[in-house]
Amino acid sequence: MANAKSSSLPSWKNPSGKTLLILLWALALALMALLSSWADMPWLSNGKLLIALGFTALVTALIGMAVVPMLVNLKASQVIQSDGPQSHLKKAGTPTMGGIFFVPVAVAIAVVGTQFNPDVIVVGLVTLGYMAIGWVDDWQILKYKSNKGLTPKQKLFLQVAIAVIFCTWLFFYGPTEITDIRIMQFVLPLGFLFWLVATFALVAESNATNLTDGVDGLAAGTGAIAFVGLGLLVAKENPALAFFCCAMAGGCIGFVHHNHNPARVFMGDTGSLALGGSLAAVGIMTGNLWGLLLISGIFLAESLSVIAQVGYYKATKGPDGVGKRLLKMAPIHHHLELSGWTETQIVGSFYLINTLLAIVAMATA
C-alpha cells in the first residue's frame, strides 16, 4: 500500500534519484556561495575551494565508472538483512566497498592540492585509517557471506587506537590552545578532559556515519553537505583543511552519482567509517567541536535513535525476555521507510535538514 501511495505522489513530493543528485549539487554550491561576503579569504576568491569540490567530484564519478563494474565482477555484493525493510531485498547483488575508490581519491587530491600540507596529511591518514577498518569489516562480511564482520570489540579497539594515535600527535604538535572548545562567543577550557572528548568524538562520529548508511545516497549526500559546512567554518583559520573538506565533499558527490536511488554501488563500512573519522579529525584539529556537533545533527539523530530503541527494548523487557520497540525499526531512516516514506523522500528531507544545520553552525560560530 505504501509503495502504491508513494508512486501516485507528485514528482516534487517523490523525487527521483537523479533529481536528488541535482539537489545535492545545488545545496553544496549554495552553501559555498555564502562565503562570497568573506572577502579576506584568498582561497575562495581564486576559486580553489570550488575547484576542489568540482574536480574531485568529476574524477570520482569517472573512476567509479571503472571500479563499480570491477566490484560486480569480484562479486563484492552487499549481504541484505532479511529482517530489514522488505523493499531492500531487491538490492541483493549490489556491490559494496565503494568507499575504496572515492575516499582515497579525495584524500590524494586534497594532499596534492594543498602542496602536502602537514595538517592535511595527518587528517588524510586518519581518514584512510578508518577506511581500512571498514574495509577489513566489509571483507570479512563478503568472505563469510553474512552480516558479521569484525566483532564490536575488535572494531572499537581499532577505532580507539587510531583516535589515540591522532590525539597523541596533536598533543605534541598541535596548537597550545587545542584543548579549548569554542561555543559561540564562549571558550570552554577542558584541559586534559579534551583528549577524552576528542577520542570519543572520533569513535562516535565514525559509528554515526556508519549507521546513516542505510538508504541510497543518504550517507554520502549528508556527508558532502557536512564537509562543505565544516569547510566554511575552518576556511579563515585553516584554508588547507577547508580545501580538504571541499575535496571530501566532492568525493561524496561523485560517489552519489553511482549511489543515488537505485544505487549501483554501496560505500560499505569502507566509506562510512572514513567519513565520520574524517569529519571528527578536522573538527578536533581546528577546535570546532561545537560546529561539528551541529553539522552532524543528522548523524547524531541516527545514533540516538538506535540508542533509544535498544534502551527502551531492554527497559520494557518482560518475563518472556521480549521488550517493546520505541520505533518500528532503527535507525530512524528505517522507521520512516516502514511508516510509508520512500527512500528519495527520506534522502531529500535529510539533505535539506543538514543544509539548515550547516547554516546554523556558521551563524553561531
Curated annotation (Swiss-Prot):
UniProt entry tagged with the keyword Magnesium: yes
Membrane-spanning ranges: 19-39, 49-69, 92-112, 116-136, 156-176, 183-203, 215-235, 238-258, 279-299, 345-365
GO cellular component, as recorded: plasma membrane
Catalytic activity: UDP-N-acetyl-alpha-D-muramoyl-L-alanyl-gamma-D-glutamyl-meso-2,6-diaminopimeloyl-D-alanyl-D-alanine + di-trans,octa-cis-undecaprenyl phosphate = di-trans,octa-cis-undecaprenyl diphospho-N-acetyl-alpha-D-muramoyl-L-alanyl-D-glutamyl-meso-2,6-diaminopimeloyl-D-alanyl-D-alanine + UMP
Biological pathway: Cell wall biogenesis; peptidoglycan biosynthesis
Short name of one Pfam family: Glycos_transf_4
EC number: 2.7.8.13
InterPro entries in alphabetical order: Glycosyl_transferase_4 (IPR000715), PNAcMuramoyl-5peptid_Trfase (IPR003524), PNAcMuramoyl-5peptid_Trfase_CS (IPR018480)
Annotated keywords: Cell cycle, Cell division, Cell inner membrane, Cell membrane, Cell shape, Cell wall biogenesis/degradation, Magnesium, Membrane, Metal-binding, Peptidoglycan synthesis, Transferase, Transmembrane, Transmembrane helix
Localization of this protein: Cell inner membrane
PANTHER family: PHOSPHO-N-ACETYLMURAMOYL-PENTAPEPTIDE-TRANSFERASE, PHOSPHO-N-ACETYLMURAMOYL-PENTAPEPTIDE-TRANSFERASE HOMOLOG
Family recorded in the similarity comment: Belongs to the glycosyltransferase 4 family. MraY subfamily.
HAMAP family (alphabetical): MraY
Role, per record: Catalyzes the initial step of the lipid cycle reactions in the biosynthesis of the cell wall peptidoglycan: transfers peptidoglycan precursor phospho-MurNAc-pentapeptide from UDP-MurNAc-pentapeptide onto the lipid carrier undecaprenyl phosphate, yielding undecaprenyl-pyrophosphoryl-MurNAc-pentapeptide, known as lipid I.
Name of the molecule in the record: Phospho-N-acetylmuramoyl-pentapeptide-transferase
Organism: Synechocystis sp. (strain ATCC 27184 / PCC 6803 / Kazusa)
Gene giving rise to this polypeptide: mraY
